[in-house]
């Protein structure tokens, strides 16, 4: 029978000092012996996805106490990738994931907490907390802040939906007037919540449902909707129940590593492929799997990408649908339900509800359960009112979207594309693989051959695109931006957005050992592994080299004889200490970033720490 971890500091005469300190936090005599549950919040006023979380921790805490636990809240950092984008701040985004994981581990182990409720939302916070949950392997539930409502405005007397990416693209388009840019800017992000499309934040929150670690609706219920409050309350109640099952009934099946099995990771990746999620999710799932001790690799993602179709096309892959539309169509359980009917889901994996995925789908899939209460839950919709307050409206759609032939979510017979929304490409320029979000690529350029134009930094690439150096037919190569080479593996949202602004969105490709925002679309290929700084062949590309991209055959190659590549590699190695480093790049790199870069592995390993260096 497992003993409460917190007993280390709450039981025995020798812990009188620790108990005295616990009492000073508000604990009473009858609290000692109850499970101490860490409420891991991530409130900050810097990030719209987290600005409304200030009171969420205490909301959960009070429910934990009602259910018989002791709640203690602490906060993690949270970086807004959109605000950090396009300048040196982006170097800190990915490293913050590992810092969050470490900080949660530090706090929970230092204070011997028995369980966690993780309140996350945006890009690196959810994966960082997931990594910590796998390390700690104590009862854990995830509940996120929820998606932002889609922006809406009238331009040229036409009502259009907007999001952050529209503001970025239109602001760089000389054909768009200052007045229209102003309207777009002020309409793109109308409420609190994670940016309204299937960008990285919402993708990761959706994947927690498929992993089995969050409640149904977590990924899709709007941040502003009153119904989301119940997810927080239920998380507080459920974590106490799970604690009792583990610590009192010797039930290890409720622990994160028991739920997030290899099959659960396959379910999560299949969902990601089916919904055309952010390519960053690949990086994060690989990292979380390593922390969980699960042997889930790029080869598994490649295998799944060849059999799972794309069943939903959501912003940034289309302007028609945003997260509010996904929820109306049945949310993540709606997509998983269609994958299940197609025979593409492991049905017997367990979830945090104590159900198998099959049992959970029977309750929460709107196609197989026509219960009015469930119907009402998924009719929760946007209000269209600017606000930073959670649970501030209770608007509902008149009907759910259960049209699986033409709606937001499709069945297998009416798939958006038979090819999935993400693909892994291999070749002599990326021997360990690279990632492309095929859901965001026009099918006319799934096969593309072009001349390389090489940049040693994102900043130089932006200048080259806006300055007219990049022409139709180019493959823009941005290297030394990987986890080690950046260091920090910046997102390349501005280069991809500016290619569209310059009318080159369907006329060029972009290849990088960096990564992309979840808001990226177009022929944008990232995570090239090994990265240039680790001796990857992307570091050997010269201007005007021919690069062939073949998505259907999952191939990407530098059209050069092996002998020429060997000559170039030998010449690079001859540079000694200057080998595999960018030329003429001026970049201030702090000690903290140098430490991250020193230990970072390439993207195919999730950019986690290289433990052989410890």
Curated annotation (Swiss-Prot):
Residues of the active site: 517
GO molecular function, one term: magnesium ion binding
GO cellular component: cytosol
Entry note: cofactor: Binds 1 [2Fe-2S] cluster per subunit. This cluster acts as a Lewis acid cofactor.
Regions annotated as coiled coil: none
GO biological process, one term: L-valine biosynthetic process
Class in the EC hierarchy, top level: lyase
Reactions listed under catalytic activity: (2R)-2,3-dihydroxy-3-methylbutanoate = 3-methyl-2-oxobutanoate + H2O; (2R,3R)-2,3-dihydroxy-3-methylpentanoate = (S)-3-methyl-2-oxopentanoate + H2O
Subunit annotation: Homodimer.
Name by which UniProt lists this protein: Dihydroxy-acid dehydratase
Organism: Actinobacillus succinogenes (strain ATCC 55618 / DSM 22257 / CCUG 43843 / 130Z)
């Amino acid at each position: 029978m497992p003993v409460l971890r917190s007993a280390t500091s709450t039981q025995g005469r020798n812990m009188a000092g620790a108990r005295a300190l616990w009492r000073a936090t508000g604990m009473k005599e009858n609290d000692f012996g109850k499970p101490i549950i860490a409420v891991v919040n991530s409130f900050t006023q810097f990030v719209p996805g987290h600005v409304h979380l200030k009171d969420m921790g205490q909301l959960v805490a009070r429910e934990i106490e009602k259910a018989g636990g002791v709640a203690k809240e602490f906060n993690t950092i949270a970086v807004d990738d959109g605000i950090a984008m396009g300048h040196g701040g982006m170097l800190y985004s990915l490293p913050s994931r590992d810092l969050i994981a470490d900080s949660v581990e530090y706090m929970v182990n230092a204070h011997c907490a028995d369980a966690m409720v993780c309140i996350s939302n945006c890009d690196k916070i959810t994966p960082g907390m997931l990594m910590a949950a796998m390390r700690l392997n104590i009862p854990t539930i995830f509940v996120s802040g929820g998606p932002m409502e889609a922006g809406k405005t009238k331009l040229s007397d036409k009502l259009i939906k907007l999001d952050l990416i529209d503001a970025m693209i239109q602001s760089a388009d000389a054909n768009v007037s200052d007045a229209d840019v102003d309207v777009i800017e002020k309409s793109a992000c109308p409420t609190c919540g994670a940016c309204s499309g299937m960008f990285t934040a919402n993708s990761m929150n959706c994947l927690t449902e498929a992993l089995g670690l969050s409640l149904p609706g977590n990924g899709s219920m709007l941040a502003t909707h009153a119904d989301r409050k119940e997810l927080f309350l239920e998380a507080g109640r459920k974590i106490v129940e799970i604690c009792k099952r583990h610590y009192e009934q010797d039930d290890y099946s409720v622990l994160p590593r028991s739920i997030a099995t290899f099959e659960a990771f396959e379910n999560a990746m299949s969902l990601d492929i089916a919904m055309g999620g952010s390519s960053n999710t690949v990086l994060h799932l690989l990292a979380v799997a390593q922390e969980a001790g699960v042997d889930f690799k790029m080869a598994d993602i490649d295998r799944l990408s060849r059999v799972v179709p794309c069943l939903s096309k959501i912003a940034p892959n289309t302007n028609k649908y945003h997260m509010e539309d996904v929820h109306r169509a049945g949310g993540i359980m709606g997509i998983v339900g269609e994958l299940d009917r197609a025979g593409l889901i492991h049905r017997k994996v367990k979830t945090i509800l104590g159900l198998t995925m099959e049992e959970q789908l029977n309750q929460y899939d709107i196609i197989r359960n026509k219960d009015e209460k469930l119907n009402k839950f998924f009719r929760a919709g946007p209000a269209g009112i600017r606000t930073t307050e959670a649970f501030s409206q209770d608007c509902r759609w008149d009907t759910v979207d259960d049209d699986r032939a033409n709606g937001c979510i499709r069945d297998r017979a009416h798939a958006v594309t038979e090819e999935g929304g993400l693909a892994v490409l291999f070749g002599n320029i990326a021997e360990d693989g690279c990632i492309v979000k095929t859901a965001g690529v026009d099918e006319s350029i799934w096969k593309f051959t072009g001349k390389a134009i090489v940049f040693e930094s994102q900043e130089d690439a932006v200048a080259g695109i806006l300055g007219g150096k990049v022409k139709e037919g180019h493959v823009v190569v941005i290297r030394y931006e990987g986890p080690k080479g950046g260091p920090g593996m910046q997102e390349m949202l501005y280069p991809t957005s500016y290619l569209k602004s310059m009318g080159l969105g369907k006329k060029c490709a972009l290849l990088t050992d960096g990564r992309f925002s979840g808001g990226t679309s177009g022929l944008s290929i990232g995570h090239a592994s090994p990265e240039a700084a680790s001796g990857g062949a992307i570091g050997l590309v010269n201007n005007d080299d021919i690069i062939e991209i073949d998505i259907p055959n999952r191939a990407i190659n530098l059209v050069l004889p092996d002998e020429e590549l060997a000559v170039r590699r030998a010449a690079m190695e001859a540079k000694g200490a200057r080998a595999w480093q960018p030329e003429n790049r001026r970049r201030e790199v702090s000690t903290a970033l140098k430490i991250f870069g020193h230990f970072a592995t390439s993207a195919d390993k999730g950019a986690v720490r290289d433990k052989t260096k410890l």
